């Protein structure tokens, strides 16, 4: 996707907002977390699934309003390969919904994001 496409989406939706997807399992509504934890246990896989399900709900609600989403890689990396799989599936779903995707994969970020990178790589 090109930035020309993003500009077209902004014009069509009359909205330049980008929805940030900076997921933390504890921010996912309890009923979504419970369903994922019932299926996978309170594991990285369960947390990653909860985040994916929450993201899908957000994108379903926002896809007619916002032109783009921005998943923050640190929060997915923190959950190991299961989190990266959730990020991949989030990106694929966003594209299916016609959303422009801006992957936030920078390093040297603000404190909370730097902490998430640290947790993901150093434990």
Which role fits each region the language model picked out?
Residues 1-123:
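Active-site loop-to-helix "anion-binding N-cap" substructures in soluble metabolic enzymes
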């Amino acid at each position: 996707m090109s930035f020309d496409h993003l500009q077209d989406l902004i014009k069509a939706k009359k909205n330049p907002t980008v929805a940030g997807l900076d997921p933390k399992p504890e921010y996912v509504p309890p009923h979504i977390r419970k369903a994922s934890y019932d299926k996978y246990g309170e594991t990285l896989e369960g947390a990653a699934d909860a985040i994916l399900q929450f993201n899908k709900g957000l994108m379903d609600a926002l896809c007619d309003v916002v032109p783009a989403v921005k998943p923050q890689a640190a929060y997915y990396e923190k959950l190991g390969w299961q989190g990266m799989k959730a990020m991949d599936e989030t990106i694929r779903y966003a594209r299916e919904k016609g959303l422009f995707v801006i992957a936030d994969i920078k390093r040297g970020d603000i404190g909370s994001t730097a902490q998430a990178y640290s947790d993901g790589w150093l434990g």
